[in-house]
């Protein structure tokens, strides 16, 4: 009824965690895109649905979300298996993990890529936005005006053009 009255809604289904077949049917019925978080991709094996080769058009890809550590922070605390698998899959040694995860998100077939400024800037855990379940000390990170450089603008423009993520 809501969609009939309002049309297609800008809703992203947070389909993280345990998702039943019924939930997936409902998500597809209403054409809500699902979430693909790259930081979740390397904990298992090649069949992990968060790996880019499993992304679908009707999804939104993130290197990490506001509820995750930055990519640099994630790498620092990842298990040895996660680091080894990510290094092999992404073809990196972890040196530029944030830049690699950002580029991987842009390269995904997902309709939408959402990238945090913290990851674009390659910041560590001190720039983490939120830690779910903790009631204080979060949501305080602010983008320093000095971070908005011509170099950053060129990077974002280049990635947008390379991966056809520029506005029509």
List PLM regions with ranges.
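Catalytic cores of glycan-processing enzymes that make or break glycosidic bonds
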Residues: 1-168
């Amino acid at each position: 009824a809501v969609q009939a009255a309002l049309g297609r809604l800008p809703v992203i289904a947070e389909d993280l965690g345990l998702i039943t077949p019924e939930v997936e049917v409902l998500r597809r019925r209403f054409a809500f895109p699902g979430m693909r978080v790259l930081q979740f991709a390397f904990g298992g094996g090649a069949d992990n649905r968060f790996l880019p080769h499993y992304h679908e058009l009707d999804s939104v890809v993130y290197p990490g979300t506001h509820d995750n550590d930055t990519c640099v922070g994630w790498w620092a605390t990842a298990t040895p298996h996660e680091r080894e698998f990510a290094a092999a899959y992404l073809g990196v040694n972890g040196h530029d993990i944030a830049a690699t995860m950002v580029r991987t998100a842009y390269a995904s077939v997902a309709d939408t890529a959402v990238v945090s400024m913290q990851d674009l800037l390659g910041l560590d855990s001190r720039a983490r936005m939120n830690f779910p379940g903790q009631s204080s000390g979060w949501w305080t990170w602010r983008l320093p005006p000095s971070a908005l450089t011509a170099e950053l603008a060129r990077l974002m423009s280049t990635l947008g053009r390379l991966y056809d993520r520029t506005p029509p």
